[in-house]
From Swiss-Prot:
Mod. after translation: Phosphorylation increases its interaction with PSIP1.
Protein name: Protein IWS1 homolog
Residues with N-acetylmethionine modification: 1
Superkingdom, taxonomy of origin: Eukaryota
Positions of post-translational Phosphothreonine modification: 380, 435, 671
Swiss-Prot/TrEMBL keywords: Acetylation, mRNA processing, mRNA splicing, mRNA transport, Nucleus, Phosphoprotein, Transcription, Transcription regulation, Transport
Subunit (UniProt): Interacts with SUPT6H; binds preferentially to the POLR2A-bound SUPT6H. Interacts with ALYREF/THOC4, SETD2 and PRMT5. Interacts with HDGFRP2. Interacts (via IBM motif) with PSIP1 (via IBD domain); phosphorylation increases its affinity for PSIP1.
Coiled-coil portions: none
Chain intervals with Basic and acidic residues compositional bias: 44-67, 85-102, 119-144, 176-197, 267-320, 370-381, 391-405, 645-656
Region of interest called Interaction with SUPT6H and ALYREF, as start-end residue ranges on this chain: 469-764
Length: 764
């Protein structure tokens, strides 16, 4: 059987063309009985030839046919040969199919009823009714052998395992609209998809997707169900008289594929089925080959089904109900064994029980498939709704963030407003410009200011939370009590008194400072000398220089008091120079001040006023500029630690801060510039006397507009470094020796210098 099957006659190359010849011969020259066989053969061949287009499917078909033919009983050998030849030798299929028409009388397995058992099995997956016809034959024809009834169950099982590949192959080939047997996917699309037996194919079960059609053990089960006595129409796979779309294995999905009626009705419907079989997808083709193999060799259905399931597992993995199909296949393999062992008479009785089992299995699997798919659909719908809700929430959050922090465009305005609040707005009367840092740094660091502002707000929130903290441990309560009872005594630097509570001293000092500033303003209005601040200045400086009180002063509001002292008097005159110098020094020594403190105290405006005032001393202006730079850098997130910057960063910063000079425009009157390279290469000729733009006089060189920021490399590093090395290398001993030699040379007695009148031997 192997040799016959894998012989050159069965090659894929010649299988496609003879299909049409076989169809013609089967339709024209054969009797009705023969037409049934030839038609089934041709249908199988046609689908098989189409199936040969796909190598993988064809390979599977060959494997199944070979195994089936090998496993055929001696009586089935003839049937398997004819079937295999029909598949792979379509030209000879007509004669062989005729022999089949005659052969049924000879062998019980090849009986006319069962001739369709093999042929119809070929067409089972073509028409999806082969299993139906065989099963009904088992009921109607008691003389049917174990083969025919083996096929009933095995086809159900193999169709289960083979269904997954069908729908996948059917998608591409199911594009032929005119034929109702378009494909699994198209039949699923049709509203009438599973009009077959009421039991097997409930209308609500229309296959929703390829995976369903693959999973559907229903069609297979429907074969057995459709064989119920009330529906004897499905005697043979070819009996397509009845438009009842007998939803058999693959064609349970094809609405118009009527259940296979007996061979009598096949004559008219056979011709229709032939084109339909051509139109049927690679699924049906693969099914044809597999079903033929099933009819021939049912003993090895186990191996076939296991191999089929193994090969088709990759496809089943795509399907949700893969496991169900495999389980059912295993159960049905066991059933096939029992069927093979039983006699033909026993099989007639056992077929009914097997059918009932298959039906129950199919119903269970169908219900599982439907439940799984419904659950998946619900999940997908739920996920979609959740995603929409998540999007809405994200949009709401974004809008809230914009309300809280403002958009990016607003961040720049916020920084400008903050600078204006702290240092005041720049006026036209400015005489000097502040060049602390360049605009690029400010723009790059705008985002960090928002973070710092958020941190400040968080700190405020934390303070509020601390006030409202209800729960305190015993240890914390004890610490608070101890702190309140005994404040630390701090000794003043002048060695004087002890201060029991720093807050009282700081608050009293601030009150005195504010009073002195108010008195000076009143005295200035009265045209009297304002000396209150000067008299209080030493005490203020003494307390403000104490390291342990600086934080307390800042928290208590000393910045507003200093602002009052640095502000100009009502007559627009500046306070005393000594006051300005001392307070600016103290401000530099104070620790970092928060932006809120700078904003509310107004110290920034006072310092900026001094920085811009034309009569302010240069030293005070420098200190004021440093203060402004130091206070404003945190607003823009710039670091004030230049030591941490690399050389490249410093050079880049200097380059960016270079003042942009106005480019001199080369306009009329001046000689138009020429590209020297073009002049040298001859592309552009030099101007000659008489040419426009030629100047017959010497010209002053054009000033260079370039900014030289890259220092040229020093090419005499070794020479310049030697003196340093020598100086560093001189030790005390060397210095002493040199000094001693110099003294000795100077202390030596010099002889009388001989000189000549001509000037010879004179020391130069």
């Amino acid at each position: 059987m192997d040799s016959e099957y894998y012989s050159g006659d069965q090659s894929d190359d010649g299988g496609a063309t003879p299909v049409q010849d076989e169809r013609d011969s089967g339709s024209d020259g054969e009797d009705d009985v023969n037409e049934q066989h030839s038609g089934s053969d041709t249908g199988s061949v046609d689908r098989h030839s189409e199936n040969e287009t796909s190598d993988r499917e064809d390979g599977l078909t060959k494997i199944h046919n070979g195994t089936d033919s090998e496993n055929d009983e001696p009586s089935n050998v003839h049937a398997s040969d004819s079937e295999s030849e029909e598949l792979h030798r379509p030209k000879d299929s007509d004669s062989e199919s005729e022999e089949h028409a005659e052969s049924p009388a000879s062998d019980s397995e090849n009986e006319a009823v069962h001739q369709q058992g093999s042929d119809s099995e070929k067409e089972e997956l073509l028409n999806g009714h082969a299993s139906d016809s065989e099963k009904e034959e088992g009921r109607k024809h008691a003389a049917s052998d174990s083969e025919t009834e083996d096929t009933l169950q095995p086809q159900g099982s193999e169709s289960d395992s083979e269904d997954p590949p069908r729908p996948q192959a059917s998608d591409s080939e199911s594009e032929e609209p005119p034929k109702p047997r378009i494909s699994d996917s198209e039949s699923e699309e049709l509203p009438k998809p599973r009009i077959s037996d009421s039991e097997s194919e409930d209308p609500p079960r229309p296959q929703v997707s390829d995976s369903e059609s693959e999973e559907l053990p229903k069609p297979r089960v429907s074969d057995s169900e459709s064989e119920d006595p009330p529906r004897p129409q499905a005697s043979d796979s070819e009996s397509e008289e009845l438009p009842k779309p007998r939803v058999s294995d693959s064609e349970s999905e094809d609405p118009q594929k009527g259940p296979a009626s007996d061979s009598e009705a096949e004559d008219a419907s056979r011709h229709k089925e032939k084109p339909e079989s051509e139109d049927s997808d690679g699924e049906n083709k693969r099914e044809d080959s597999e079903v033929q193999n099933e009819s021939d060799g049912h003993a090895d259905r186990k191996g076939l089904h296991s191999s089929d399931s193994e090969e088709e597992e990759p496809k089943r993995q795509k399907i949700d109900s893969d496991d169900d199909g495999e389980k059912e296949g295993d159960e049905k393999v066991a059933k096939r064994k029992a069927a093979v062992l039983s006699d033909s008479e026993d099989e007639d009785k056992a077929s009914a029980a097997k059918k009932s089992r298959v039906i129950s299995d199919a119903d269970d699997s169908d219900s599982d498939v439907v439940s799984d798919k419904s659950g998946k659909r619900e999940k997908t719908v739920a996920s979609d709704s959740e995603e929409e809700v998540g999007k809405e929430e994200s949009s709401v959050k974004k809008s809230e963030e914009k309300d809280l922090f403002g958009s990016d465009s607003e961040s720049g305005n916020e920084e400008e407003n903050l600078i204006a609040d702290i240092f005041g707005e720049s006026g036209d009367e400015e005489e000097e410009e502040f060049t602390g840092f360049n605009q690029e740094d400010l723009e790059e660091e705008k985002n960090e200011t928002q973070l710092k502002e958020a941190e400040d707000s968080d700190s405020d929130d934390n303070i509020k939370r601390g006030k409202h903290m209800d729960f305190l441990s015993d240890f914390e309560m004890m610490l608070q009590r101890k702190k309140s009872m005994c404040g630390k005594r701090r000794r003043n630097r002048d060695g004087g008194t002890f201060i029991s509570d720093a807050d009282d001293v700081v608050s009293a000092m601030i009150v005195k400072m504010n009073e002195a500033a108010e008195e000076d303003r009143q005295l200035n209005n009265q045209k009297k000398p304002a000396l209150k601040k000067l008299t209080l200045l030493p005490t203020v400086v003494m307390h403000l220089k104490k390291q342990d009180l600086k934080e307390t002063f800042i928290d208590s509001g000393v910045m507003s008091a200093i602002k009052e002292w640095l502000s100009p008097l009502p007559d627009r005159s500046l306070p005393a120079l000594k006051i300005r110098e001392e307070l600016l020094k103290i401000l530099q020594e104070l620790p970092s001040v928060s932006q809120e403190t700078l904003k509310h105290s107004g110290i920034g405006r006072a310092v900026m006023y001094l920085y811009k005032h034309p009569k302010e001393s240069r030293s005070n202006k420098d200190m004021a500029g440093k203060l402004i730079n130091e206070w404003s850098r945190p607003i823009f997130g710039l670091t004030s630690n230049y030591k941490g910057m690399t050389r490249e960063e410093r050079e880049q910063r200097d380059l960016e801060q270079m003042p942009q000079r106005r480019r001199m425009s080369s306009t009329g009157g001046q000689t138009p510039r020429r590209d020297l390279e073009k002049v040298l290469t001859g592309e552009e000729k030099a101007l000659r006397p008489g040419d426009p733009g030629f100047c017959a006089r010497a010209r002053v060189p054009m000033p260079s507009n370039k900014d030289y920021v890259v220092r040229p490399k020093w090419n005499v590093e070794m020479e310049s470094s030697r003196p340093g090395i020598l100086k560093k290398g001189l030790s005390r001993l060397e210095k002493h020796k040199r000094r001693f030699a110099e003294q000795k040379r100077l202390s030596q007695m010099h002889r009388a210098v001989k000189f000549s009148i001509e000037g010879n031997r004179m020391p130069l």
